Structures are given as C-alpha cells and as structure tokens.
Amino acid sequence: MKKYLTAIIVLPLFLLALGCTPRYEEPVDGYKPSSVDDDFPIPESAALMQTIPEPENPNIDNGAKYEVKGIGGEQGLATPKRYFQEIQAAGWTQLEEKQMGHVHFFQKDDTVIALEVREDSLTVYEMIKDAKF
C-alpha cells in the first residue's frame, strides 16, 4: 500500500517538475558575417555588445561579444545545433577535441575561431596563428 501511495505522490511531482523545465528554442532568423572574421557566420539577430581589440589572453588576436536572445539555453548549457550546422556549412570544421566547457573551436584553412556560447550571448575570438590551446 505504501508503494502505491508513494507512486501516487511522486509521479505527479515528477511530471510537474518536467513540465516546468524551460525549453530551449534556438533563434532562427538567418545569419550574417561576424565583425571578427567575415567568413564566420553569426545569427542575424546578434547585436554587438563589445569589441575586444586587445584581449588579455596572449593566444587571442581579437574578439567581439554579441547579444543573441535565446541562444545557449539556460546558463548557456544548450548547444545551438542548427547554428553549429550553419558554421560547418560555411566551411568551418569543429575541433571537438579542443572544446573547453562553453568554448568551442572552429578551423577554416589557417584561421581558428573560438566561440564562447553563454545564455543570451556569443563571444567570437580569432586565435593567433600557432596558438596554444
């Protein structure tokens, strides 16, 4: 009897918690060139928040931070799959073995871009040639 009572109490709580979990929806409105590298796409809705001309990291040449509502999901934990597919369609190869948490690396020819995905923001960094990362 206690098993059934526990199931009757726990199941609705589980379903309630599942229903209250925020759902990540990737913004899809087209893409435009980033200010860091003309060949690297960013979402059309991306608004430039800050340019980073002289980063503190010696492996980074320059960067830019963009506000993109809805990207990254809650706490930046959701990978924007359609966006990554667009980056790859533009000729960039994801260096999955180099990923560090929120930072993803993409390479095209001799250029390496680090893309930091956070909740509602993207930061695009161009790495220096022969960067150690």
Report each predicted region and the residues it spans:
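Positively charged n-region of N-terminal signal peptides that target proteins for export
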Residues: 1-4
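Flanking scaffold residues of small Cys/His-coordinated metal-binding clusters
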Residues: 12
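C-terminal motif of bacterial Sec signal peptides marking the signal peptidase cleavage site
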Residues: 15-19
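Compositionally biased P/S/T/G-rich terminal and signal peptide-adjacent segments
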Residues: 23-71
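Extracytoplasmic electrostatic interaction patches
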Residues: 52-133
